[in-house]
Amino acid sequence: MGQKINPLGFRLGTTQSHHSFWFAKPKNFSIGLQEDERIRNCIKDYVKKNKKISSGFEGIAYIGIQKRIDFIQVIIYIGFPNLLIEGRTRGVEELQMNVQKEFHSVNRRLNIAITRIEKPYGQPNILAEYIALQLKNRVSFRKAMKKAIELTEQTGTKGIQVQIAGRIDGKEIARVEWIREGRVPLQTIRAKIDHCSHTVRTIYGILGIKIWIFVNQE
């Protein structure tokens, strides 16, 4: 039976790069890793609390962290920055202060920058959030998957695969449903593939969403 490997970890160093970039002594590595996790969780919690109610989702593709001895640079790659910044002139400063408090760092400066992604629906995290929102609003899972694929095709990707697992449409027995459009060569290491796993809590229980997007081949 074929073993499933995470396509991002499988391609690290070839088509994928790390979202955290820093060096540490082996004994301090776990501390640095926990710091990164705290920073990311703090940012996501802040965005969740301050996002527009009407939008329903955060739109964060990923958070990049670069560390030096006395400085930490955090870059938030977001699809819809207006959801976070609009109507709030000090949005980024407030977020920076929140993270700094959580971080308890005296000797290191922290800087947060927001980078807008040109084609947000080409990012699997944003697409998974979109599908999750549709499922919460009781839209048919097939309709949600097809609409997500239509949105992705507009960004010029070469292929996409969407998978939803769990008690779909409230059925007694959990099952897996998936749909693919175009090519998704998971076995080819030089193929640049973006992937994400996302969970959504519906009235019937938790559903798992997985998305693979074939961007291009190097």
UniProtKB/Swiss-Prot annotation:
Subcellular location(s) of the protein: Plastid, Chloroplast
InterPro entries xrefs: KH_dom-like_a/b (IPR015946), KH_sf_prok-type (IPR009019), Ribosomal_S3_C_sf (IPR036419), Ribosomal_uS3_bac-typ (IPR005704), Ribosomal_uS3_C (IPR001351), Ribosomal_uS3_CS (IPR018280)
Pfam families: Ribosomal_S3_C
Top-rank taxon, per record: Eukaryota
Record's GO cellular component terms: chloroplast; cytosolic small ribosomal subunit
Residues of the KH type-2 domain: 43-118
Entry keyword set: Chloroplast, Plastid, Ribonucleoprotein, Ribosomal protein, RNA-binding, rRNA-binding
Main location: plastid
A GO term, aspect molecular function: rRNA binding
Any Gene Ontology biological process: translation
Subunit organization: Part of the 30S ribosomal subunit.
Annotated family: Belongs to the universal ribosomal protein uS3 family.
Name of the featured protein: Small ribosomal subunit protein uS3c
Designated gene of the protein: rps3
